[in-house]
């Protein structure tokens, strides 16, 4: 009966977690990258549990208590506690100190990309034992994993700042481990528990069996079971976790300090959007061109200029020579009197700099989405360590697919329409 009740509870939790993921994503107001992957893992876990329920798979009750669901639940709870979640189970590529190409799974990327979270559901006892070299062969300690996170984060800056790392513990963490993580610059969330010295080096009685059923689950959990030979800090005195003595309970940091980038590089698409007649109230038209009618409808639904102004406020504004020259050509060809007047006012606020694409930008391979003009504009922004404002999301995605991620502010596009209003139908 106990096994049956435990099984039913785990099935209920799996179903609830799927519903909670939907709520998290709807709260963000945008699609959360990795949602399908997380839901896939939850469904795989649910399917496995339902096989156990149907008698197709036989496992011990202790294994039910320590399924992959523990880690998946920790990920969901972390995402629920954070703002501006952009992705879950995101895989970042980086190079290890010896030059080897590595990948790292970040459970939750939040705060618009500025915060990386590793969610840990394993018990404090097991984590502490592994750290002291008393785990199973191949177990990788949390401290070693923290080193990987630091290495990867330094190679994945967001707006030219390294992401802030949080390790979220949902079954406690020993006080010495928490102290070590803090020394490394990593924030800790969860209950910090005391440790006691083990007389005569006796072993820990309680073994954490998390993941024992993993080979039975169709989709392997890849977030928390990193394996690597690890025996760091072997000179530590053997200690036992005292779960009953909680030293501190730490919540997620409410305010993560982010170094704000005060330099902005304007793409041609932004220059056009900023001066467009559509952006200045003249959006109540049906144009002959379908794309202009669509942009007018978007503008009536959500004005783009306030977003641009808010982002640009108090920042140093730049544009490269190529962007300005091509903008002027487009303006001379398609711009109306009001648009041209606003353009002169905007250009007077900018510091125009020579094209100076960064080294990594020049390594990009040309394609339909990656052209020379975009390389000059985004590459110059990269050299300036500025955030490039753009409506050219196609280039941003294409560059990211080649491993180059630019710091960008993406907005909806608006075309120059003043010269076409005379033959448009007012609405």
From Swiss-Prot:
Stored InterPro entries: DUF1308 (IPR010733), DUF5614 (IPR041076)
Chain intervals for the UniProt region annotation (Disordered): 200-236
Domain of life, source organism: Eukaryota
Record field: compositional bias (Acidic residues): 200-234
Entry similarity comment: Belongs to the UPF0415 family.
Protein name, entry field: UPF0415 protein C7orf25 homolog
Organism: Danio rerio
């Amino acid at each position: 009966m106990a096994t049956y009740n435990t099984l039913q509870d785990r099935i209920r939790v799996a179903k609830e977690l799927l519903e909670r993921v939907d709520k998290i994503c709807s709260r963000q107001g945008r699609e959360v990258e990795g949602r399908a992957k997380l839901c896939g893992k939850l469904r795989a876990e649910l399917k496995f549990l339902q096989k156990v329920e149907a008698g197709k798979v036989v496992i011990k009750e202790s294994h039910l208590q320590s399924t992959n669901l523990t880690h998946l639940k920790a990920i969901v709870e972390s995402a629920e506690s954070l703002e501006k979640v952009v992705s879950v189970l995101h895989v970042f590529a980086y190079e290890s100190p010896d030059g080897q190409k590595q990948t790292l799974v970040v459970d939750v990327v939040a705060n618009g990309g500025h915060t990386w979270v590793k969610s840990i559901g394993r018990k404090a006892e097991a984590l502490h034992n592994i750290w002291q070299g008393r785990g199973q062969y191949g177990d990788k300690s949390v401290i070693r994993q923290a080193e990987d996170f630091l290495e990867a984060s330094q190679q994945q800056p967001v707006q030219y700042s390294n992401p802030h790392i949080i390790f979220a513990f949902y079954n406690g963490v020993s006080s010495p481990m928490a102290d070590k993580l803090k020394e490394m610059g990593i924030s800790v969330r969860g209950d910090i528990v005391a440790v006691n010295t083990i007389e005569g080096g006796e072993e820990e009685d309680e073994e954490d069996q998390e993941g024992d059923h993993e080979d039975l689950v169709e989709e392997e959990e890849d977030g928390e079971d990193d394996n690597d030979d690890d025996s760091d800090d072997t000179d530590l005195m053997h200690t036992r976790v005292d779960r009953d003595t909680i030293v501190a309970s730490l919540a997620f940091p409410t305010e993560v300090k982010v170094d704000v980038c005060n330099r902005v590089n304007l793409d041609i698409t932004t220059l056009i959007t900023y001066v467009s007649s559509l952006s200045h109230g003249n959006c109540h038209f049906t144009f002959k061109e379908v794309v202009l009618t669509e942009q007018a409808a978007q503008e009536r639904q959500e004005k783009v200029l306030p977003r641009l102004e808010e982002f640009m406020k108090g920042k140093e504004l730049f544009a490269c020579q190529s962007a300005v020259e091509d903008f002027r050509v487009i303006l001379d060809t398609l711009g109306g009197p009001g648009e041209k007047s606003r353009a002169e006012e905007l250009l007077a606020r900018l510091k125009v700099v020579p094209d100076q694409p960064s080294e990594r930008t020049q390594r990009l391979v040309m394609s339909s989405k990656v052209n020379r003009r975009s390389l000059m504009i985004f590459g110059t922004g990269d050299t300036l360590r500025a955030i490039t404002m753009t409506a050219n999301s196609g280039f941003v995605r294409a560059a990211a697919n080649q491993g180059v991620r630019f710091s960008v502010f993406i907005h909806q596009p608006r075309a120059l329409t003043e010269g076409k209003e005379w033959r448009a139908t007012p609405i």
